[in-house]
Amino acid sequence: MKKSVTHLEINEKLSELPGWSFSNDQLKKSYLFKNFREAMVFLTAISYEAERLDHHPGIYNCFNRVEITLTTHDADNRVTEKDFTLARAIESLL
């Protein structure tokens, strides 16, 4: 089982990820794009990062809006360093 990150560590790490928040034991962020196509290009890029890192986000998409949630299933659905690694990778796509 993966080791979850403490609330203090989460707050420290979130300071380096503008727009990301923590609630309900998940990291979360919403993105707005110009149109649906741009949102889908972003989601496709996320899919490659998720596969590369072997860590997969929760994704919600409606037209030009994308919502990402991150939690680690094999850490009892808590936040781990894997979630922050994927969040940083997602941010690097913009």
Short names for language-model regions:
Residues 1-34:
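N-terminal first-folded block
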Residues 19-22, 45-57:
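Short arginine-rich
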Residues 24, 61-65:
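Short Gly/Ser/Thr- and Asp/Glu-enriched loop/turn motifs at secondary-structure junctions
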Residues 35-44:
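Short amphipathic alpha-helices within nucleic acid-binding modules
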Residues 44-45, 88:
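Solvent-exposed alpha-helix faces
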Residues 54-60, 89-94:
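A short N-terminal helical cap/helix-turn-helix that marks the beginning
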Residues 67-93:
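C-terminal structural segments of small proteins and small subunits
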